[in-house]
Each structure stands twice: as C-alpha cells, then as structure tokens.
Amino acid sequence: MKGSYKSRWVIVIVVVIAAIAAFWFWQGRNDSQSAAPGATKQAQQSPAGGRRGMRSGPLAPVQAATAVEQAVPRYLTGLGTITAANTVTVRSRVDGQLMALHFQEGQQVKAGDLLAEIDPSQFKVALAQAQGQLAKDKATLANARRDLARYQQLAKTNLVSRQELDAQQALVSETEGTIKADEASVASAQLQLDWSRITAPVDGRVGLKQVDVGNQISSGDTTGIVVITQTHPIDLVFTLPESDIATVVQAQKAGKPLVVEAWDRTNSKKLSEGTLLSLDNQIDATTGTIKVKARFNNQDDALFPNQFVNARMLVDTEQNAVVIPTAALQMGNEGHFVWVLNSENKVSKHLVTPGIQDSQKVVIRAGISAGDRVVTDGIDRLTEGAKVEVVEAQSATTPEEKATSREYAKKGARS
C-alpha cells in the first residue's frame, strides 16, 4: 500500500514537468514567429542589408591633397666634398732664423701680405759685398776704356803696335763681362734679401702655424711655415653615375651655366649655390662614376674645405607637370597607384606612371589629372569604393581621431 502511494506521486511529478516543458516550447515558438516579420522589415530598411548592415561604423579618417600643375626642376644628385680652390704650403726659400710671424691663425690674407721674416743680416752683408765688387769693376772698366781711347789715337800715328791695341780692346771686353757678372751677383743677393720677407702667394685663409719664432728654418723644410687655403672662391667635387653624363653634356650645350646647390649632411639645409665648373676626363671603372667640379663664391664662408655635402645640379625644368605629395604614391602588385577621392569622398585605386620625385613631391605623368584629390595618410585602411572622412593634417593625430581610427580598424570600412 505504501509502495503504491509513492508510485502515484512520481507519476504526478513527471506529468507536471512535461506540461511545463510543453508550455515553454510553445511560447518560444510564438515569440520567434512574431519577431521574424520585424527582423525582415528591418533588414529591408537597412541600406546595406544583411551582413553588410551589421558592419556599419565610423568613416575611416584620411588626409588628402590636390594634384596641382606646376613647373618642376630636374636635379642630378651626388655626394661630394668641399675642396679649396688652391692649397699652398708657405715655405722659406732661404735658410736662416725665423725672426717674426705677421699673421693670426685663421685670418684671411691677400696675395702679397707679409707673413714672416727671416733674419736678414747675412743677406744684407752678401748684397753689400756684391755691390762693392760691382763698383770696383765698374771703375776698372772706366780706366780700361780710357786707355783704349788713347791707344786708338796713338795707333793712327803708329806710336803703338796693332797687337797692343787689340790687347787693350780685349781687356775692355773682359771687364764689361765682369761687370755683367757683378750685376747678376747683386741681383741674386737682393733676391735673397727679399726672400727673407715671406709673403702670401695667394688670397685665402691661413691655418695653424707650423713653426715658432726663433727656430732655424731652411728651404728644404717640408712642413713649411703655414698652409693657406683659398676659400673665395671654393670648389665642390662630387660624383655622378656614368648614365648621367649624356644629360649633363646636353644641358651644357644649351649654353647656360648649370646651377649646383650644396646641401648639408642631412640634406635638410641649403648651404650655398654655385655653378658647374668642369667634368673629369675619364670614368672611374671601379665605381662607374665620374667626378664633377662646381665652384662657389662662398663670400659668406658657408662652405669649408673637406666638408661633406650633398650636391644637387639643376639640368632641366619640366613645365606643366602634375604634382602630388610623395606620400600619396603607393606600390602594389600591378605597379604604382594612388587612392583618388571623388565628390562623395569615396576612394578608388588609380594606376599611375610616376616621373621626377623627391622626399616631398612626385610628378605623375599618367593616371590622374590636375585637380584630382589623392589620399596622403590613412592609406593602409582603404578598400575600393570605401567612403572616408577627410580630416585636416594638423588634427589628424588628436586623441579623438586616434580613438575613431582604432574603432574603425575593429569594425571595418563603411561603403
């Protein structure tokens, strides 16, 4: 009896659970059916529909620039070194004690300026001796000429022999030769004295002195007294690939001087501007380059000997060229391309043919026209036909736009 009672309770519990489960199943099905028309309607009203509607999010922020038409100079570039137009080691041409230096290290001097003095005492003595010998021989010559005149008169009356007359004539000629030798000795002694005063052979800047006052110096010293570098003007020697030779020669034939610019080591600051002076007469077979020399006035002393610079030589100017920022030019499997914005700020990929370019701008020879807008920043997030938001360059890195950019990267572009 007790077992029968428990069995009835088990049956009741099972029936209740089954009823509850059936109710939940029926209720869930009705909810699903009632929600379906609304979902369908929402999908129909969504512009993108289906899965694309779920991807809607903020527009991709980009920066853009307009292609412009302008004259673009064509430069040939190379690495070079500044060299003095002339470098002279000032040496003494006579032996003696250095008595004085008349320059300040690093100063600019003119040709003929006194730089140093050698003790002139010995040269003055030698000059005086030569001058004394000359005076003595001149007196001897004068006396010999008087004797010759008397001999010539006596020879007319046969008071002297022809032999005596010839001997006197020979003595006069010999003394005249001695006079010429004496005059040369005087000139040599005077030259030695003049050389005791050492002057600048060229205009330029003197370097550090190589010898101190009081030292004995000679004409054989290799170090010299000081080195002068001529920096007004000054030269730039740089190299160009042999493939550029024809371009340079053709530009020279135009008859106008080719402008050469010297830029600093980082290629960010223009130091000076000069003109092409000459090309070397042969190509370096090892490097396949040719040396080129340009000359600069350098009146502002912007260039210094042995200074490393970047050279830029203007060889041509391309007129009416379509120019865009270099940042807009991209490279893909199909070649160079840019992202072009239409009036609705939707982007499309255009294959282009680039021309002259540098770190700032590039000439586009085909693919776009002047007035087209191209994307310069935010390119990595673009897809064909995507609509974007064009932002100003100065506000492109604000925290708000950075957050928008991150959100866009998560959700995808909106078409």
Curated annotation (Swiss-Prot):
**Positions with biased composition (Polar residues):** 31-47
Keywords annotated in UniProt? Cell inner membrane, Cell membrane, Membrane, Signal, Transport
- Biased composition of type Basic and acidic residues is found at 399-415
Query: What is a GO molecular function of this protein?
Result: efflux transmembrane transporter activity
Q: Could you tell me which residues belong to the region Disordered?
A: 31-60, 392-415
On induction, the UniProt comment says: The mdtABC operon is transcriptionally activated by BaeR.
**What family does this belong to?**
Belongs to the membrane fusion protein (MFP) (TC 8.A.1) family.
NCBIfam families associated with the record: PRK11556.1, RND_mfp
The entry's function note states: The MdtABC tripartite complex confers resistance against novobiocin and deoxycholate.
Self-association state and partner proteins as the record states: Part of a tripartite efflux system composed of MdtA, MdtB and MdtC.
Protein known as: Multidrug resistance protein MdtA
Protein's organism: Escherichia coli O8 (strain IAI1)
Q: Which gene encodes it?
A: mdtA
